[in-house]
Regions:
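Active-site and donor-binding regions of nucleotide-sugar-utilizing enzymes
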Residues: 20-177
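Membrane-proximal basic amphipathic "stem/tether" segments
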Residues: 1-28
Length: 177
């Protein structure tokens, strides 16, 4: 991991490809939910943003990402490098865009994290207690909420600083319009 962190610093200095990078992902094997719709929005409406999407090369959804451009093969050398270079790690799961979710979850618990701001898009509206999403168990810089009651519940009970949970809606809802 230290190698990739160090190599990431060098790449950010030497290549614009790795500067101001936004990395988006869902589970790593699909592109159908909030991660995909957010990515598509950025590619179509904000082409000035250096954004890439992490997905497995044998995914049934790979063609959708390739059509938009910016595919990062999950688990590849480029994936590790992009993970450590990214300014924003945006995903629908814990440890957004991590090359190995379990490993990076445990490393984060010990304070070893990637440099990028972590954005948790999530999949849907939280209505029940989910202790693993509390601040003491998960580090995120932005926790996207899709409904006002959900936002209030997370804000009041999950232990995050006031600026972390934000009521902005879910990206996939935009596809319904």
């Amino acid at each position: 991991m230290a190698f990739f962190k160090l190599f990431g610093v060098v790449c950010r200095c030497c290549s614009a490809k790795y500067r101001e990078l936004w990395l988006v992902c869902e589970r790593g094997n699909d592109a159908r939910d909030n991660g995909y719709w957010f990515y598509r929005y950025l590619k179509e409406k904000h082409p000035e943003i250096n954004v890439r999407y992490v997905i497995e090369t044998d995914s049934a959804d790979r063609a959708k990402i390739q059509a938009l451009g910016g595919m990062v093969p999950r688990g590849s050398f480029f994936h590790y490098l992009a993970y450590y270079c990214a300014d924003f790690l945006i995903g629908t799961h814990v440890q957004p865009c991590a090359p190995d979710l379990i490993l990076f979850y445990h490393l984060a618990g010990k304070g070893i994290r990637a440099r990028g701001k972590q954005v948790f898009l999530q999949h849907g509206i939280i209505k029940d207690e989910m202790e693993w999403l509390h601040r003491k168990n998960m580090y995120v810089d932005l926790f996207v909420c899709g409904a006002k009651p959900e936002y209030e519940y997370i804000r009041d009970t999950f232990g995050y600083p006031e600026h972390v949970p934000q009521y902005v809606g879910l990206a996939r809802f935009d596809n319904l319009i």
